[in-house]
Each structure stands twice: as structure tokens, then as C-alpha cells.
Amino acid sequence: MTNKLSPAVPPKFQPINTILKTGKSSQLRYIRLGKLLITGFFIIIASLFFLYPQIFYCELIRFSGFHSENNKIYFSPQIQPKSFGRINRTIQKAEFRVDSFFVGQQSRPVIIVCSNPQEYQKYCNSTEGAGCSLGTPWGNSYVVLNEQGMNVDVISHEMSHTELLARFGWWTVATKTPQWFNEGIALMLDRRFVNNPDEIGRYFDYMDEWLYYTGGGQQILELRDIGSIKGFFNASQKQVMLAYMSSGLEVSYWLILSEGRGLEQLMQAMQEGKSFEEAYRQAEEKQRKIMFKKLPTNPLRFQDSKKISD
């Protein structure tokens, strides 16, 4: 009996035109996907420009008609060059104040100096005030100033906001840090309302301001009600001033309890994963019971006062 070997089965080859069609269809899919991604990107950019046009104007400031010698400070073309030196000196004084309070300045915001309400509206998206600050998730920050009302207090106030952005990060400031704390820290550099270099004296002065705006403590604004930007600013002018004074009162009190290292301890604790509330309490814990007997009670903390005295 003889064994007959079966002939080997030849491999199946696809016709060359089938391969070309398959490759072409894959390319078409990638092209369509690329077009969708590009279209989606431009839609997102257009939406962000519609919602936050001031960010885009600030990002493109170097392509505007504003003058700058160092890409750090941009002057409106309407500002005379002879004024540059005076404005630069005012900005430097504000930077020294920030550097002193934070024990070193980490932020390097681009500063835009406007000469009229139209320019200020364009770069700040507001017609109120003499200055504003803007921060981006990608790390850029801007301080927009109105030449007519800018001074060391205004500039250092806004630079305080950009300093917190540099130290804590945009996401932490935007989502985890209450607005009253952000504004309260800024008031420690802004001397338009209280000008007292002594920590305890500053707390007493903010207490006086707070008593004035609350009608002797009759119209208290709780800190939890001014934790968001909307809660802080979406109110009457009198209520906004009360929000500022409440923030100044609380933060000046906290800085006494945290013995000058509060910001550093707060930042470190939050980097370790603690919530703002937990880190804030932890920074003052050591001195809270000691100073409770030495300082007038903070009216924004009556519940805490009861717990300590019990």
C-alpha cells in the first residue's frame, strides 16, 4: 500500500486591488477622525473665547499695539513714555510688599497698564475698580491695571492673588480655596482699609471696620456664604464691602494664631491631601487655646469660642 502525499494547500492571497481598497478606507477613517478633532478643537477655542475673551486678549498682548521693553510690563499706546518710569517704580514698590509678606515672590505675572475704560474692559472684562488679576490653568497670570486709579495698594492686592495661584496652583485656588481666604490674604497687603503693621493691631482695626459695616454686629455675613466668587461679589456694594471686612477680620485673626507660618503650613498640608478646612485648622491649632484668653473673641467664630471655653 502506497501513501500518497496530499499536495500542499497554497496560501490564500488577497488581490492587490482589495489591499489597496482596505488601506485607502483606513486612511479615510483617520482623515475623518483628524477633521473631527480639529473641528472640535476650534469649537472649544471659540466657546472659551466667547466665555472668557479677556484671557485670549491677555494671551495675545504681545501682538497688540501695547508697548513693552521686557515682555513683562505692557503700556497702552495712549500712555506717554515719560510716565513709564513713574509706573515702573509704583509696580516695584508693590512687588517689594508682596516679597516681604510672602517671604519671597514666586509669581511673575504679566502686567498690562490700560489708559482708558475701553482698554480696561477689554483686558479685564469689567469696568469696575482700578485693577484685576487673571490666571490660567496652564500657569500664565496677568495683572490688569487702570492707569487712572492704580497705586501700590491696588497692585499688591492683585499680585497677592497671582501669588496664591503660583504657590497653590490654579486648580486648588479655583476649586478648593474659599474666596474669602483669597481676598482676606490680599487685604493683608492692601492698606486702603486698614493700615496697621502690627498683627494684633490690624485685627482690632478690622474688628472696628466689621462692626461698622454690620451695624454693631446686627447683620453678620457668614464665611460659608462668601466662599465662592459669586457669593462674594454678586451683591450690593455695601454687602461686598462687608464681605471684604469679614475676610480681613478672619484672616488677620488666623495669621495671629498661625504665628506667621500659616501660609506655608497650609500649603504643605493641602499638598499632602488634606482639605482646606482641615489644613486651615491645623495651622492655628497650637495657639488657638492660648490666644483665646488674650484676644477679643472673633465674632465670626462664636461656635468655636463656646467649644474652647467649655
Q: Where would I find each of the regions flagged by the language model?
A:
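Extracytoplasmic/secreted envelope proteins and their assembly/folding machinery
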Residues: 84, 88-95, 99, 156-157, ...
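Charged, low-complexity, helix/coiled-coil-prone segments
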Residues: 26-44, 92-104, 121-137, 182-199, ...
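Short, flexible active-site loops
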Residues: 8-13, 169-171, 232
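Generic alpha-helical secondary structure signal
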Residues: 11-14, 81-85, 89, 118, ...
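Juxtacatalytic substrate-recognition/specificity segment
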Residues: 58-173, 178, 276
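Acidic/His/Gly-enriched intrinsically disordered linker/tail segments
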Residues: 173-247, 256-310
